[in-house]
Amino acid sequence: MYRVIIADDEEAVRNRLKMMVEKFPDSFTVVGCFENGFDAIENSSQLEPDVLITDIRMPYISGIELIRHFKVEFPLMQSVIVSGYDDFSYCREALR
């Protein structure tokens, strides 16, 4: 069972992502939903996530910074980036 954290500053998006993940209860469980990267980091040590689903632009800490932080704390964690932006430079930055 993969443990998933969702970080997105839009509540509707967080809720929709959570619903999508929960369609696979044998494989995934959502262990935390956060409206910003700071809250995700503050709660991550007790949640021990395997997967991060994050927006790129959020208050306090960007999704890219959040991924970088989690890669140090949880090196095997996988990340999924969601964004409404059409600027592909965010994707290139996230892949670095």
Model-flagged regions — what are they?
Residues 1-3:
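Non-catalytic signal-transmission and effector/linker regions of two-component phosphorelay proteins
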Residues 7-8, 34, 52:
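Conserved sequence signature across two-component system core domains
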Residues 9-11, 56:
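Generic detector of well-ordered alpha-helical packing
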Residues 11-32:
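Two-component/phosphorelay signaling modules centered on CheY-like receiver
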Residues 20-21, 35, 68-71:
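A short alpha-helix capping/helix-coil boundary motif
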Residues 27-35, 43, 91:
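Short hydrophobic/Thr-rich beta-strand motif most characteristic of the beta2 strand and flanking loop
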Residues 41-96:
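CheY-like receiver
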